[in-house]
Amino acid sequence: MRILLVNYRYFISGGPEKYMFNIKTMLENQGHEVIPFSIHSNKNVATEYSKYFVEPIGGRDAIYFEEVKKTPRSIWQMLTRSIYSKEVEKAIKREIDDVKPDLVYLIHFVNKLSPSVIRGARKKGIPVVLRLSDYFLLCPRFDFMYEKRVCEECLTKGYRSCIKKRCVKGSLFASVVRVFSMKFHKLIHVYDGVYAFITPSEFLKQKLSANGFEEEKIHCIPTFTASKTKVGEPQIGSYGLYFGRITEEKGVETVVQAYEKLQKYTVKIMGDDTTEEAIRLKRYIKEHKIKNIEFLGFKSGEELEDIIKGARFTLIPSIWYDNLPNTALESFQYSKPVIASNIGSLPELVVDGENGYLFKPADAEDLIKKIKLLDDDTVVEKMGAASRRRLESRFSPETHYEALMKVFSEAVKNNK
């Protein structure tokens, strides 16, 4: 099968891109041809198909909204890429004409490519399968968060809540544009052109089906790990570990609050420590002279793996509806118990008392209780083994591939 893989970044910047390259490798290893469509960036992985890529909004060095210089041209591009871009539609149709794919597998496109990629593919008679990593189809700011708490007002009261609260980037303009784009996409039924929606979690699947999306078109196919490293014998480490993005919704503040009261315990926090949230937390730790919390910064490769191996357990303290984070599966790979917030998809990963513990989101006292339950090496070893078994039974590459190919084959067969 020849598959056109669409994502607005062609370099690793987070979980969706890790998945993109992992699935690309997996499909190619199974004999499929995978061809990318994306946006030009100086960070992109080299590919002969970059000649089809579209220009970014703010230059090839800009990645995030805040880095884009606001000019009349860039503002116009922001609008079209949020609502509908004829430029992008033309580009993907040109690539489809040349490479003649059997199917489009769409990952991330919102605000950078626009749903014109869906229309472009359908106008060329190519079926589209869309994988969802967040809640952009339901929430204007993608994460159901407002002021450090879960908010679903847009589902119950309508999108005026988003505009009133300036939910998107704290900006009235950005909030209005996002709400308008969502209403416009609904008006033109652009997502009717998607043959199937792939969700990593049952939680996201249920959210979609409860809010107007056809249940028979939604398929829960959990992601997988694809590390080539030999894990070796499990280790019972000496410290707790958080690794991942250090942003408000990830709940790292709860970890800091807990370990401030657990002076005999140690925690390491690994991830980009230049974010606004990381800087704030590091300042707090310094001001309060907390010695048992260590920020490691961003790590990768063998260094990252060694730090995970050396952990006693890992922490996923999210305060948002986290959607099957890769950090959980990476923890399972190294036979680590996981202490996670009881929110979103996390109970699908952590069975309380079996391969870790669940605690009340943002509740440092409850987290402290769960940390102390892992003082016993026997419990740590038993739960770590359960994590590994859970990974192999539910989140293996083989399981993911089989389920995904079933959807792909049906999409191509039933394409009209």
Model region roles, listed by residue range:
Residues 18, 238, 245-261, 365:
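A conserved mid-protein helix/loop that constitutes part of the nucleotide-sugar donor-binding site
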Residues 366, 379-394, 400-406:
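A short, well-ordered alpha-helix in the C-terminal region of glycosyltransferases
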Residues 30-32, 36-99, 103:
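A conserved catalytic-core segment of Leloir-type glycosyltransferases
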Residues 137, 156-230:
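Donor nucleotide-sugar binding/catalytic pocket of nucleotide-sugar-dependent glycosyltransferases
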